[in-house]
Amino acid sequence: MAGAPGPLRLALLLLGMVGRAGPRPQGATVSLWETVQKWREYRRQCQRSLTEDPPPATDLFCNRTFDEYACWPDGEPGSFVNVSCPWYLPWASSVPQGHVYRFCTAEGLWLQKDNSSLPWRDLSECEESKRGERSSPEEQLLFLYIIYTVGYALSFSALVIASAILLGFRHLHCTRNYIHLNLFASFILRALSVFIKDAALKWMYSTAAQQHQWDGLLSYQDSLSCRLVFLLMQYCVAANYYWLLVEGVYLYTLLAFSVLSEQWIFRLYVSIGWGVPLLFVVPWGIVKYLYEDEGCWTRNSNMNYWLIIRLPILFAIGVNFLIFVRVICIVVSKLKANLMCKTDIKCRLAKSTLTLIPLLGTHEVIFAFVMDEHARGTLRFIKLFTELSFTSFQGLMVAILYCFVNNEVQLEFRKSWERWRLEHLHIQRDSSMKPLKCPTSSLSSGATAGSSMYTATCQASCS
């Protein structure tokens, strides 16, 4: 643990806090909290040994010490001193024969690094790279960490651009797009909360590692700020699931009911999307504070407490899956009613299905009911890969389907381009032929007619 942490170790610790939407069960992959607890116990044992062991027989020797990494006995002058790799390391079982080395000089002083007051030591046999397993769990977790970081970054960028587009064009302001904007906001907040959590843990871990302040790791995990960051992430994730549910319910109401009071129903949707998650995230935080107030709330000693959050999210996933099935049935019936050939029906059905999966979060059903405490080994990796990869890129797919390839958005861009082109052409004509005035009445009437037609179209499609 001396020095800055390697990428594998950091990815492992970050993923220990991710899972699907929350803490991992006790007994799953090693966490930062567990590692520092083991380090504390190792330090206690070392300090007891340093106090109780008898002094050496000679007067000249290198003093026994604990250097925040390993426990060193008294050293004989002019010799190498070695101790086994510290057992608190998460990968200690993979380097059972490894040792860390120091050199005791003839003067009875520990050899120091060049141009430094720190003692020299060789811990190459205890490093992660010496474990020999190219497909180790930590390397798999590093791969997942890279995947979900790239996914959230792309999703965040695409969603910000898509939100600006929907807000920038006045003709796109309608109930349907307001719902889309709230869904975009939930994805943006989810990505931001993950970035904040990762950045906080990375900064805290790296700083403590460089300064050998391992107690600072645990004190941060025990701090209010760490728990608030994690509580915020839980709320953002829950709100994201419930805005996906709102999208599904709204889609179904459009298909099932012909007349809707959109102003009233939009207020209801806002209450569901942003309000309902508070009803179970806040109680979960209170229960954790009262009965399981340890670490950064990333561990679940009692999985019943985690069900306070998990069950409402499973409910949202289940309802959206039922809506997905119902919508597919409606699409099939309408395609058959149009007397299309079987090939066209299959193609259109496949297109509709693939489009609805990211929009409703249907992929969540695959592992929705596989609880974290039951996932081990390969199943756990597949579960993590499916959830983290699909969820992180889902915002990007939603932005593409709801905005970038949307016909109304493309029409607005074409209209804006034509308007700019006509205005630019008009300015060029005015500057080159000032005596001649171009009549604008026809252009104005044409533009007005086009705008009215599009407004009516948008209102019809948004109703």
UniProtKB/Swiss-Prot annotation:
It comes from the Eukaryota. Changing residue 352 to A: Abolishes inhibition by negative allosteric modulators. The record marks 121, 128 as: Interaction with the endogenous ligand GLP-1. Disulfide bonds join 46-71, 62-104, 85-126, 226-296. It is a multi-pass membrane protein. It is found in: Cell membrane. One of its GO terms (biological process) is adenylate cyclase-activating G protein-coupled receptor signaling pathway. G-protein coupled receptor for glucagon-like peptide 1 (GLP-1). Ligand binding triggers activation of a signaling cascade that leads to the activation of adenylyl cyclase and increased intracellular cAMP levels. Plays a role in regulating insulin secretion in response to GLP-1. May form homodimers and heterodimers with GIPR. Selective recognition of glucagon-like peptide over glucagon is determined by residues located at the C-terminal end of the glucagon-like peptide. This is Glucagon-like peptide 1 receptor. It comes from Homo sapiens. The gene is GLP1R.
